[in-house]
């Protein structure tokens, strides 16, 4: 099984003599809503239909409204990774409601890759989709990692 998607960074086009050895198959665009819903169900979410709808809306809006930074990925690979993160958070923090778990996963997983210009837009989108919940959802913190970063920054000046 070989995919021909040279659009991702680091990939190159296959030469024509190698392309001729493979049978071409065409696939349609996947139904991201259905994939999200099923993955959320698989991770134990009861409100999977509603949360999947919010998830897909957010990623589509991010694709349309945020800058076209080359490191942004709002497609299936990023969706699946974020949903796995949400499942882990659900298991680690059973006291949080499902919408807060998904909000935390979306915020914490994506904020680090956003440019400063896109940060406010993204937070606004989250606030629109999860009204009034941002302040109630704790940030995942790694105190040991943060301490090491602070120490290194001080040492380097």
PLM ranges: what are they?
Residues 1-4, 20-157:
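Alpha-helical lid/collar subdomain of P-loop NTPases
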